Design a protein with these regions (language model features):
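A preference for well-ordered globular domain cores
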Residues: 1-41, 48-77, 90-239
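Extended alpha-helical coiled-coil "stalk/arm" regions
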Residues: 81-82, 87
Length: 239
C-alpha cells in the first residue's frame, strides 16, 4: 500500500467545519486511504524528491502527510532508529555513507566529492610533513615552518653574506637529548646546509602529494571509499 500526496486543499463541510483535505492524483482522500494499510506493517513517510524519511510509525493515523510530494508507504515491520540521515530507497530505510547521494532513486557514490576531500587531506599532510622537525648535524632538532624558519633562515644567510660574517650564535635550535633551546655557533656553510635540508624536505612533501593525487582518478569507487590519506602519505614518504 502506498499513498502519494498530490494536493492539499481546504474542505468545508455542510455545518461549516473546515479541515485540510489530503488527496492523491486519483483524488483519493488520505483519511479514507489510511484505513487500508495493514495494521502490522511499518508506515514510512518520505519526500518523493529527496527520499528523506520524515516519519515512521506502525499506526497510519499517526502519520501526517501535509504537502504535495509526501509519500506514505508500508513495509514489513522493523525497529527503526530515528536519525536525520535516514532515506527510503528501494523500499528500505537506509543511512547514506560519506560522499553518497541519491539520484533517480538509487544510491550513488560521489567520486569527485571524495577526491576533493582526499586532496584537502593530502594538502594538510603536505604541510605537516614539510614543516616537521629534522635532525641537524646529528645533535640538534630544527623545525621547517615556512614563516618561522625558512623565511628567517633565508634572511640570515643574506645578512651574513652581505656583512661578510662567517659565523653567528644567534640561531635557536633544540638540543636532541635535552629538548632545551640552545644557541650554538654556526657557520655560513652550516646555514646553507640547513637550507638544503629544509628545501629537500619541502620538495619531498610536494612530490609525495603530487604522486598520490595523480593516482586518485585511477582508483575504483571502493578504493576511494576506503582510502586512508595518512597511511598512503606515510608509505610513500618512507620510500
Amino acid at each position: 500500500m502506498k499513498f502519494e500526496v498530490n494536493e492539499v486543499r481546504i474542505i468545508e463541510e455542510e455545518d461549516g467545519f473546515k479541515y485540510y483535505g489530503i488527496f492523491d492524483k486519483g483524488n483519493k482522500d488520505w483519511y479514507e486511504e489510511l484505513k487500508k494499510f495493514d495494521k502490522d506493517t511499518l508506515k514510512v513517510m518520505y519526500n518523493k524528491d529527496s527520499y528523506l524519511v520524515l516519519s515512521v510509525d506502525k499506526d497510519a493515523s499517526k502519520i501526517a502527510p501535509t504537502k504535495a510530494g509526501d509519500v506514505v508507504e508500508e513495509i514489513k515491520y522493523q525497529e527503526v532508529e530515528l536519525a536525520p540521515n535516514n532515506y527510503f530507497v528501494n523500499s528500505k530505510i537506509v543511512k547514506l555513507k560519506e560522499c553518497e547521494t541519491i539520484k533517480d532513486g538509487k544510491i550513488v557514490f560521489e567520486r569527485d566529492k571524495r577526491i576533493e576531500q582526499i586532496k584537502k587531506e593530502l594538502s594538510e599532510l603536505k604541510v605537516e610533513y614539510s614543516e616537521s622537525e629534522f635532525l641537524f648535524k646529528g645533535k640538534y632538532w630544527q623545525r621547517n615552518r615556512e614563516k618561522g624558519d625558512r623565511d628567517s633562515l633565508t634572511s640570515l644567510i643574506l645578512l651574513l653574506t652581505i656583512t661578510g660574517r662567517k659565523e653567528t650564535n644567534e640561531w635557536k635550535l633544540i638540543d636532541k637529548d635535552t629538548r632545551e633551546h640552545v644557541y650554538p655557533t654556526l657557520t655560513l656553510d652550516d646555514f646553507k646546509l640547513m637550507a638544503f635540508h629544509m628545501q629537500s624536505q619541502l620538495s619531498k612533501a610536494l612530490k609525495t602529494e603530487s604522486e598520490i593525487i595523480a593516482r586518485l582518478k585511477t582508483l575504483s569507487d571502493e578504493e576511494l571509499k576506503n582510502f586512508n590519506s595518512r597511511k598512503e602519505f606515510e608509505k610513500l614518504w618512507k620510500n
